[in-house]
């Protein structure tokens, strides 16, 4: 937030190499991509956007900027004919353009933006080496933001539970809190007023709500709050996503408010120890599904927030706890994951075997994307890991060197999160694959389809033997049509067969099934234009479930329910998934029955006769039907 913020949602738009094309512009609303329109679905090149802005009163020395939440891809920004900024090589990370010197107060200002989605060997994704849509445009919101002469940026927050012992979930207790932020103020005597509140931003009123902690710090270029111990923090968990809000107010010496910021955080710890990982002290095995955004043909990568929410709900409704994104998502997506409980690995879009040989030439853009991604999203408790690449040639030394360098870079920037590489080559020679250089070995397992010549059990055993005492996650498994036959029935059987095997290996701490949905991709085998896709999902392009969706939902439920004489037996799964159920409620016949806390392997008996309305509610409000 800032002193003034305005969404710039209505623009004039046209395709062409120069802004002259705007003489025949159409009026559009942001977010927007030209590749979701029938007349331009195959267009690769430049698009031009034009709008006007008339700022009202701003204080003396005010700073103004445009915040782009995502523009795909190479972007130039002009204000009143002045080139104010460029952002090349990255289409999914947010960026800010300072327009202070070009902006005229109390007058109409012309804003002109060009966006170019031509395939590039200087960008990530690299050239044509990526398996999703090449949708160009202002695909996410654009905001005008103004502050006083001093402003805040790059706030880093530590919100870490103090776990007293490992082996059982801890819901609340002691926690460490600290933060550091940067200011661009050269004005002596500025102060930073801060306060920590319990609750999400929309549930607090800073002037009326009582903060848990607060204080005033003198401002320099770097402002730092030393760690503070909270005695009774409620920990963030995917079933109980408890949020806190850090409010920052930057004041000038005369008391004038120059900038503000509100960041939602959560206290949670995810720790890898040996061949297990622990969430807030509990060893867990977590079920996951990946969703490929941008797949509704009429919206593309410019999906509305209502559509994004529909697909996120689709993830939650099939009992997903863990997911990953091949490319960076809008901050709003992670706000949703924070509030409703999803664990996420966010990745830079470095995908496939291109460029051949040494990827060193891409280090500058990879480094910049990792910095932009971490800076924008590190406060989100839902994000547990960063990804440095997917399906590169990780059996070669140059790629392994890149992976090690990227993992080390992330650890330096964010030591509280995991850094991983996702491999599709690990079965070929397990001991020399780059997957081992991440904190977790993330393995794309297409044995039986893309990966020919391997037997499931022996291939995995060789991989585990090559990396003893490590955590593994099958990060993709599923069926891609029409490359492979069998349709949705085979998709369901592959899911069941793979999951049954994964359950036998204790070192597999989670799974990420691929894919939630059929997805649009420029390299798809089915359809044309905006309909070009891969049939890989348990829903269609629009999110309509196929029969295999129910299979995933049933197998990923944390409770197994069976009929027994006199009622039902509820057993907390002890294979995969495996985590404590706490605060769950059984709903039946218009009544609710609290289920006692059950650790993996424990059972509870309910006396009665279930009817068709029977369902189980999580404490987060999501529910699932028992498989009776």
Task: Please annotate each region the language model reported.
Residues 210-231, 589-612:
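Intrinsically disordered, low-complexity Pro/Gly/Ser/Thr-rich segments with frequent PxxP/GP/PP motifs
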Residues 1-40, 114, 197-201, 482, ...:
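Accessory carbohydrate-binding/adhesion or oligomerization-edge regions at the termini
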Residues 5-6, 11-20, 39-153, 186, ...:
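Accessory beta-strand-rich segments of carbohydrate-active enzymes
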Residues 248-252, 257-261, 610-628:
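Terminal connector regions
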Residues 103-108, 180-273:
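Extended acidic/polar, glycine-enriched regions
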Residues 26-31, 37, 82, 88, ...:
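Extended substrate-binding grooves/exosites of carbohydrate-active enzymes
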Residues 79, 170-215, 569-595:
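Beta-strand-rich binding/interaction modules
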Residues 159-175, 562-564:
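Short, solvent-exposed loop/linker segments at the N-terminal edge
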